[in-house]
């Protein structure tokens, strides 16, 4: 039996140890969902049980310092979500799991996915307050992204009709539950941004279970909300329901009805304010006219006390002029205020950001095209230099020399064999050929005469 064959023979204990090390190193920790059976808890406080599905099972242990953190008592037949390490019990050769944590499956698994995505997006800055857009005050047109047949749409329209009937509403119907719902919600948000006909969007649905609301915990929906140029109010479920969309949105409303309250004006309150302002204006005008009438009365009385008709006529003429000037001044002030209002409206229309956003998008696309071209040219240059270097390396490779029929022989000390003085009879040599190594033993060393080489006999 050769030396290499002897080194590959395992004992049972060595085999089990090697398999255990491979399992622990290669597999590490995993998440597993399964049904519990054969659950037991001896006096040590450790838990021993079997995890199974309809086709296979595996033994599992959960030590006391880990199971004391579990918030429920596992029962046979219960579906659980387990985080465990794979190992092998060497004395028996049984492979098993060592559980680190356990929680009920179903909502527990969804909650785990929710927390992982929440931490990821928070680390990327999608929840930062600096990215939040303010809502328009007041909104000129509202978009609603929800199911066309759901109660949420009915609630939103009912509140808007009650508070501000003149506010236009555009509905972007979409599924809010099921496998296709996240992609439909994303497309609705993108369509609303492309059409740019609304200055605020309500994205949401009515209440439901965690699975029902799961479309609003989808990463694609979260990124679509973050990338929206139109401010978005999230309105998912009830006040106690929290989704990823709530964290990314510019504003979170506890319910769809509350979202409608946030984006609309209370028209009844506005009417009351206008009526109050009108009443105060009328009172001010009455007071102003009363003061002027009193002034006219005093002047008239003074004129009557002086009696000269000519002076009275002059004073009457002056009063008429003052009255006309007063009326003209009032008309002038009204015209100036009207012109100022028109100029402010024109300035407001000129600062709409759509054109500037379009130009920025074009510049970004141009920069992206030039960057891709530059990277492609640089990569082509790298590929050419790499190919040349590989060709040069293959030309000087020792393996190429071996492929032509040559070999390399090493002494027992590992040095290259160049002369007969390096070896003696009985030494073992290692010879490298093109496709492997050959070990040989020297039986005789013959020194060549003159230019003749040593003869090595094996």
From Swiss-Prot:
Highest taxon in the source lineage: Bacteria
Coiled coil spans: none
Matches recorded under CDD domains: ExoVII_LU_OBF
Record-linked Pfam families: Exonuc_VII_L, tRNA_anti_2
Recorded GO MF terms: exodeoxyribonuclease VII activity; nucleic acid binding
Catalytic activity, reaction form: Exonucleolytic cleavage in either 5'- to 3'- or 3'- to 5'-direction to yield nucleoside 5'-phosphates
Main localization category: cytoplasm
Places the protein is found: Cytoplasm
Any single Gene Ontology cellular-component annotation: exodeoxyribonuclease VII complex
Keyword list, A-Z: Cytoplasm, Exonuclease, Hydrolase, Nuclease
EC number, UniProt record: 3.1.11.6
Entry's Gene Ontology BP terms: DNA catabolic process
Described purpose of this protein according to its UniProt entry: Bidirectionally degrades single-stranded DNA into large acid-insoluble oligonucleotides, which are then degraded further into small acid-soluble oligonucleotides.
Subunit structure: Heterooligomer composed of large and small subunits.
Family to which the UniProt record says this protein belongs: Belongs to the XseA family.
Name of the molecule in the record: Exodeoxyribonuclease 7 large subunit
Gene: xseA
